[in-house]
Amino acid sequence: MKYIIAIIQPGKLDAVHEALGAIGITGMTVSEVQGYGRQKGKSEIYRGAEYVINFMPKIKIELAVETKKASEVIETIQKTAESGKIGDGKIFALDLKDALRIRTGETGSTAL
């Protein structure tokens, strides 16, 4: 199993959600987060004053999938979330040792 974490632009969430649903993904966790990468925030001018925004708003998507499905999920997120601009985000794939469905006690990939 793989645990996939994607950090994407907030405006891309609906498209990514729809695209993942189209390939059979039935669940994920979504969080509003803040962070920065190479762009290190940005400066904006508001009413003549310059403001530095150090942390950019992002969306974090987390999902657990069977190993054989991981490449398809990663490719789907990448293609859907890409705008070609700085700040598009990152995708991380980690090995997932086990999962447990609390309600039924199922473990492993059947718990997904």
Question: What is each PLM-predicted segment?
Answer:
Residues 1-112:
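Positively charged, small/polar-rich N-terminal and surface patches that mediate targeting and assembly
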